[in-house]
Design a protein with these regions (language model features):
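Short, flexible active-site-proximal loops enriched in glycine and acidic residues
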Residues: 111-115, 127-135, 176-179
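His/Asp/Glu-rich metal/cofactor-coordinating catalytic motifs and the adjacent surface-exposed loops
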Residues: 2-87, 91-95, 135-141, 145-331
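Structured, charged N-terminal subsegments at the starts of enzyme catalytic cores
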Residues: 84, 94-113, 117
Length: 331
């Protein structure tokens, strides 16, 4: 983790920001809120927001994001290859259509769109790995939207059996006779714990055996599903605990035995995305670790963490304004 030893610029804490004469609720702070949680706000939006309390506005933004319907599935969203009349002609057209759809979602979708983008960069995949196959693009995007503000543990559980991810990180090839470690390694290193953070190579090897069995589809390009015939049914030892370990049991054990590491890793990424890419040991102790404890106490529901961070003095501190590099959608 990128932790420096220099004193932080922003020393405000996680206590709720309550405007005062010395620290008023201003149009500048409203712009800051909507730049971070959406893609800006117009003058009418600022005028409508000024009479409200910051906490009320934050709750409204989060509640709206939670209740926002997922983008409707296109007609081809769950096709297998045989469902296309002319795959070579139709699939590229569907890919182009989907790019236009998701660009519009991003601009109009507020916080849900922000978090969808965040999670797509966290649970990263690569188009070339699954042939830019439009149905898998949709299914992956739908998964990111569905869980964007939900339960992180259930999000991790769903990602690992998503067809796009199974293809990208070779879970589709991971069988009892020929185990593949790619997904198990990334599950620990990129998705939950962070690099070299309280797991071993042997944990990866053993976990990969629990992840076997997702090697079946009814037709190429269809959704991939579990079949016990290719699952490794022998005992596995992960984090020093020996069990027979199904996929679900592995995820449960990961979150039971490594909850602190997971929570701190994810809250660090949330902090870097929404507040500042740079932080120090004081920020880690005073901001990130308490957010991580909130995540644990909430059984890995993300919304309480977001509410706590976005309502905080730390988030609204003047030294937090204007320090995040814009992406193309922000300009």
């Amino acid at each position: 983790m990128e932790v420096t030893t220099n004193p932080p610029c922003n020393t405000a804490l996680l206590e709720e920001y309550i405007p005062s004469g010395e620290n008023p609720w201003t149009s500048q702070k409203i712009k800051h809120l909507y730049r971070r949680l959406a893609y800006g706000v117009n003058l009418a939006g600022i005028d409508a927001t000024l009479p409200l309390t910051p906490a009320t506005v934050v709750d409204s933004i989060i509640d709206t994001a939670i209740n926002l319907p997922q983008t409707a599935a296109p007609s081809w969203g769950y096709f297998s290859i045989s469902d296309f009349a002319d795959f070579d002609l139709e699939n590229p057209a569907n890919v182009s259509q989907w790019y236009i759809q998701t660009a519009g979602d991003t601009i109009e979708g507020g916080l849900r769109a922000r978090l969808t983008m965040f999670w797509m960069n966290h649970f990263v995949t690569e188009l070339d790995s699954y042939g830019s196959y439009a149905p898998y693009m949709f299914q992956y995007y739908n998964l990111m939207q569905t869980h964007a503000l939900g339960n992180f543990k259930e999000f991790v559980r769903a990602v690992g059996v998503n067809s796009t991810m199974l293809i990208y990180l070779n879970g589709f090839e991971n069988t009892s006779n020929n185990p593949n470690e790619n997904y198990a390694r990334e599950l620990f290193e990129l998705f939950t714990l962070g690099e070299n953070n309280n797991y071993t190579q042997e944990d990866i090897i053993q976990a990969s055996r629990a992840l076997t069995g997702y090697n079946h589809w009814d037709d190429p390009g269809a959704q991939i599903y579990f079949d016990q015939s290719t699952w490794d049914e022998s005992p596995k030892t992960v984090f020093g605990s020996e069990e027979f370990y199904t996929y679900d049991e592995l995820i449960d054990t990961l979150f039971e035995l490594r909850e602190t590491e997971i929570a701190q890793f994810i809250c660090t990424k949330i902090y870097k995305y929404f507040v500042s890419h740079q932080y120090d040991v004081i920020t880690q102790e005073d901001i990130i670790n308490p957010l991580a404890q909130t995540l644990i106490d909430a059984n890995f529901e993300m919304a309480p963490v977001l509410r706590q961070l976005f309502k905080s003095q730390h988030f609204f501190d003047d030294r937090a304004l204007g320090i995040v590099i814009k992406n193309p959608y922000d300009v």
